């Protein structure tokens, strides 16, 4: 099992911690180091191929099985757990003495060797130490000393920077440059405020995207499909026909916010002929348990219906009932067939839905459960859509979105395409294909979905990244993450509230330990090779591998969790290897959000390369190139697929922080010189990715942006 810089154990005597972590539901998740002879230490994530051929040992030797689904905001993982009593919650991580004792429990464990499980630990295990010993002698790359010259950056006004770009183009796209959650909303808002930008559109993806926006009164709105410009008077907002929509959820979760706030949206929101996400698509998401059946929003199933030309679009709801009925009957065959294959009754499905909602989070809406209960399911759906959509006076106006966008550009207006998710979460990117969303969320995908003539209209992409604390959610490889992507899920940490309050709460001490002890030769150019040492951090709750401590502390301190789900995101270093490809495809402009976080760091880490290392010596063939131990993948080299990235480790360049010269909007006066550490960070990112940093975020407010002279 691939494992990397993570681990830690809670002290048994810690006040309140034992009770908080007393559930035995994850007892099979952390076998002893001696039982992981075939594991791959220090790799970032589960390798699916490995999961299918290796088995974990149950700590207690107990063989009663139950299934627990762990879902991240973008993907789902199903882990089969062996346990004596099914329950929810966290398991107290075993002590090292317990690990040693478990090595003698092989006979009982052998009876349960079909279990798929993760072998993650909270503390630093021996496997991780061995891999570090293999990598610590890696010769320092010359690139660690680059760039030789630190560029000086100066602040300019929005009119001198962003608005010049907007005015020179017809179509402006704001796109995620990493794995989503980069803070795109602030840039969207800045572009939308330009007087020539009259149209803001969401043109693909669906309810699985999300963003939080505020109006002038400071009221908070959480949207999924609704464009961010919806709160701006005089702007027209569109949801294009390549989007997928659950119209019932859209009305209940998004439009209701506008109605409650007294905002008249009828002259500023228009919906195209979107594909409809039905209740059975969401139930297929629940029952399928596939790697990309993500948030119970029905994304993969509805895109399947769309590609197969089954299902329904919004126009079907407003037209002939007989056609609507026949199409629903035909498309529902997939759902009914799955029930038959799995030997599930309607009552079984209802029970599973209620189990998903049992912790108080409404993951499966009431109308979806009502559909599962209904005897005449097609009739139920037709009545649902008649009442909630066709005959609902609050449902937004419909139009030909493609025509309206094209007409606006021809009139000399600017169109803003608001990108959901990101480049690397796009289903069109083969490198992370198995762990992506179901739409093409690259800038090219946005432009294609808008159907705006790229030969006739000038377009530009504003890429958005985030640092420090670049993050990804869901399974998949991400070499620069502090822990594997499914680490929190594997520990049954569904929200940050599942952690005892004092767990890794001292962010200041943890980041200091990381940069002081995790990179012991950071001040010696001849010895610093950028490989992070698996050191430990200790607090009143226990001992933690520094990667785990940083992952927990970053999620808590920076608020890196879902706006609604509160599921923690996995943070890590800014990744120049991945960013270089993004820039080469849809660059050069880059805006970096949340850089005021750097005010609290002794140093800031940037991944400038990877080193491939598999402890078993296995090679991986990707696109005809064979990756073997010791191979270096630099920024600008071809990015391999996840089969290789699972075994890649970041080579980190360290840059001095700027504690003495904070850039946070609340502490900095505009137009004051930018600190050298920040300038070195920006110079490093530009050097290794060939991008142009257009602006940086320095606070929570919409106008907390520092625009840079280009």
Curated annotation (Swiss-Prot):
Q: Name one GO cellular component term.
A: cytoplasm
Where does the secretion signal sit in this chain? none
How many and how are cofactors bound here? Binds 1 Mg(2+) ion per subunit.
Molecular function in Gene Ontology: adenylosuccinate synthase activity; GTP binding; magnesium ion binding
Q: Which cofactor does it need?
A: Mg(2+)
Where does this protein hold Mg(2+)?
A: 181, 210
Question: What spans are recorded as compositionally biased (Polar residues)?
Answer: 32-43
The record's family statement is: Belongs to the adenylosuccinate synthetase family.
- Record-given protein name: Adenylosuccinate synthetase
Specify the taxonomic lineage: Eukaryota, Discoba, Euglenozoa, Kinetoplastea, Metakinetoplastina
């Amino acid at each position: 099992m691939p494992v990397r810089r993570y681990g830690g154990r809670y002290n048994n005597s810690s006040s309140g911690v034992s009770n908080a972590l007393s559930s035995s539901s994850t007892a099979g998740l952390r076998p002893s180091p001696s039982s992981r002879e075939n594991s791959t230490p220090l790799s970032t994530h589960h390798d699916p191929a490995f999961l299918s051929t290796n088995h974990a040992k149950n700590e207690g030797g107990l063989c009663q099985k139950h299934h627990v689904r762990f879902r991240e905001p973008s993907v789902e993982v199903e882990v089969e757990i062996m346990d004596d009593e099914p329950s929810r919650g966290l398991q107290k991580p075993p002590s090292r003495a317990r690990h040693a004792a478990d090595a003698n429990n092989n006979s009982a464990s052998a009876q349960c060797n079909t279990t798929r499980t993760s072998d993650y630990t909270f503390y630093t295990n021996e496997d991780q130490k061995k891999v570090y010993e293999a990598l610590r002698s890696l010769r320092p790359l010359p690139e660690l000393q680059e760039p030789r010259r630190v560029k000086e950056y100066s602040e300019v006004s929005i009119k001198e920077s962003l608005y010049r770009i907007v005015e020179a183009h017809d179509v402006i796209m704001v796109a995620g440059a990493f794995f989503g959650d980069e803070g795109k909303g602030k840039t969207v808002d800045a572009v939308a405020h330009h007087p020539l930008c009259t149209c803001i559109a969401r043109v693909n993806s669906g309810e699985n995207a999300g963003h939080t926006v505020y109006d002038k009164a400071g009221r908070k709105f959480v949207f999924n499909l609704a464009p961010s410009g919806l709160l701006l008077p005089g702007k027209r907002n569109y949801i294009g026909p390549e989007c997928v929509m659950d119209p019932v959820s859209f009305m209940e979760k998004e439009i209701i916010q506008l109605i409650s706030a007294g905002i008249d949206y009828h002259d500023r929101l228009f919906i195209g002929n979107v594909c409809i996400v039905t209740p059975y698509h969401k139930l297929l998401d629940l029952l399928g348990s596939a790697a990309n059946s993500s948030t119970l929003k029905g994304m993969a199933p509805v895109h399947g219906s769309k590609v197969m030309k089954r299902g329904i679009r919004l126009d079907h709801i407003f037209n002939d009932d007989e056609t609507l009925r026949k199409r629903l009957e035909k498309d529902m065959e997939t759902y009914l067939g799955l029930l038959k294959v799995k030997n599930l009754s309607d009552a079984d499905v209802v029970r599973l839905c209620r189990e998903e909602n049992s912790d108080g989070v409404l993951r499966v809406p009431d109308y979806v459960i009502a559909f599962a209960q209904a005897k005449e399911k097609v009739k139920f759906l037709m009545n649902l859509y008649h009442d909630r959509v066709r005959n609902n006076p609050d449902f937004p106006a419909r139009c030909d979105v493609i025509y309206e966008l094209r007409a606006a550009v021809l009139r000399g207006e600017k169109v803003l395409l608001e990108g959901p998710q990101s480049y690397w979460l796009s289903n069109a990117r083969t490198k992370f294909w198995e762990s992506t969303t179901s739409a093409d969320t690259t800038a090219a995908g946005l432009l294609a979905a808008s159907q705006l003539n790229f030969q006739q209209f000038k377009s530009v992409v504003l890429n958005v990244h985030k640092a420090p604390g670049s993050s990804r959610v869901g399974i998949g490889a991400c070499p620069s993450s502090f822990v594997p992507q499914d680490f929190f899920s594997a520990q049954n940490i569904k929200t940050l509230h599942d952690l005892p309050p004092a767990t890794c709460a001292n962010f200041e001490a943890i980041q200091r330990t990381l940069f002081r002890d995790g990179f012991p030769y950071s001040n010696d150019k001849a010895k610093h090779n950028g490989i992070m040492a698996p050191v430990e951090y200790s607090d009143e709750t226990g001992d933690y591998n520094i990667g785990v401590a940083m992952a927990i502390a970053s999620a808590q301190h920076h608020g890196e969790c879902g706006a609604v789900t509160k599921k923690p995101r996995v943070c890590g270093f800014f990744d120049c290897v991945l960013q270089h490809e993004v820039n080469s495809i849809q660059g050069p402009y880059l805006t970096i959000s949340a850089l005021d976080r750097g005010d609290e760091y002794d140093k800031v880490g940037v991944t400038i390369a990877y080193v491939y290392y598999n402890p078993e010596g296995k090679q991986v063939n990707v696109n005809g190139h064979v990756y073997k131990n010791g191979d270096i993948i630099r920024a600008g080299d071809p990015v391999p697929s996840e089969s290789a990235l699972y075994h890649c480790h970041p080579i980190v360049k360290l840059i001095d922080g700027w504690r003495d010269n904070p850039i946070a909007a609340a502490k900095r006066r505009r137009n004051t010189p930018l600190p050298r550490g920040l300038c070195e960070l920006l110079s490093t990112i530009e050097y290794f990715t060939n991008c142009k940093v257009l602006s940086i975020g320095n606070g929570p407010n919409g106008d907390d942006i520092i625009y840079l002279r280009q």
